[in-house]
Amino acid sequence: EPEERDLFYDKNGKNIITGKDLNITFNTKVRVAGRNKTLSINAVNNISLNLKEGETLGIVGESGSGKTTLGQTLLRLVDRESNTEISGHINFFDDKIDQLTRRQFKPFRNQMQIVFQDPYASLNPRLSVKQIMEEGLIVAQNIKNKKERLDKIETIMNEVGLEPSSMQRFPHEFSGGQRQRIAIARSFVLNPKFVLLDEPTSALDLSIQKQILELLLQLQKNHKTTYIFIS
């Protein structure tokens, strides 16, 4: 049975992520009756949304309905390419980010994170847990001090229910639920303001799903993180 929850956000608080009149179309070349034609697939049709600090938006729909495309577009993981048409506007806080180049967008990347569906495929098997989390701290936050990085990793591992003493181990040494905790920790070690949760429990057993959902709720409460939850 669904449980009633207290709201963690202020309805009159600051806007974190805003999308206005978003349209996303993928153009694919197909061959019909010996001729090349362009097939246009409208994945997202005129969507607008506005999320406050600490708010959660759930997006539910069948496979192929554009849920992930919408979420990844807000994170600038789907960009305008030769076969992709994107229109509309995206704001992060008061900054208009939809027209930024990759280089201009880089300062925003650590504040906007994603937790993927499959904890087995989303982690690099060649990196230890420490290296997986350290990567973002070095690349996104440019933290050069090793002790500072280690302190952040130990803190977030404790927060997600992982033993810091296991940080030298590799993903294959953990269960599915533990791997998803690692993936969540990888995002939250950067202290993001907005996280896209792309079916984060669908690959897990039912008993583990509840534990992960409880963890995500607690992290949201602690950090006032804004979520889009795709299911």
Where are these regions (language model features)?
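Conserved ABC ATPase signature
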Residues: 170-174, 178
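ABC ATPase NBD coupling module
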Residues: 33-36, 96-113, 139
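A short, proline-enriched helix->beta-strand linker immediately N-terminal to the Walker B motif
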Residues: 189-193
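Hydrophobic anchor residue at the start of the ABC signature
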Residues: 184, 212
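Conserved ABC ATPase "signature" region
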Residues: 92, 96, 147-165
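Q-loop/switch helix immediately C-terminal to the Walker
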Residues: 127-139
